[in-house]
Amino acid sequence: MSGLGLVVVSAPLPSGGRRVRAAGEILGLAFGARDVEEFLRRAGLEDVDVETSELIEWQGGGPDVWAPGP
């Protein structure tokens, strides 16, 4: 297990995508759940179910929300 701590997926940005952060660093800009999985894999976390993992805090909507609200 990596020392990333909580992974935060921000609310969808007006320009599209969601920032993914852990340990005070931006891991990347995700445009879907697979992007989040890849960022976690690169950070040393394999086989994380991004839809149910308690390691991930979804802000502004869950893993099925990728467009900004009205």
List each language-model region with its residue ranges.
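N-terminal domain-start interaction segment
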Residues: 1
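A generic structural micro-environment signature
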Residues: 7, 15, 33, 51, ...
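A short, charged, amphipathic alpha-helix used as a generic interaction element across diverse proteins
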Residues: 31-44
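N-terminal acidic leader/helix
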Residues: 4-26
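Mixed-charge, Lys/Arg-enriched low-complexity segments
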Residues: 42-70
